[in-house]
């Protein structure tokens, strides 16, 4: 049995932080955490066992089970004999009509934002590092990994298990 409030359906064991806004006709699955200052648009389907931080989600977005969105990226600065983690203060922006397959991990930006364009679909287990930008109408197959600060244009398809190095610009 689920709970419904203002046309939003909530599963069991959900944690919602302060200043979270959730649009109408959205469904949130069991054991999902939405941390403070997250915006979720209308007509979204947010699955179970998901963590969302530092993220703005557009309308008609599907996030399948197990995704981690807006987590801290892997960014370090080597100084003398130690590595120091640099801050990740950016966000994740999921535009309208985006779909994330199960167990995707989308890191928030270090200073700017990590962005997925409208009508873009990610298959299961895709990883996007900090500051990656994917254009509109892209299809990304399973187990693709994007290293930090890579930009992908519009209407791009990427086959399964591809590894994309950091700081690249892939055109339309």
Predicted regions and their residues:
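Structural signal for interior beta-strand "rungs" in well-ordered beta-sheet cores
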Residues: 2-172
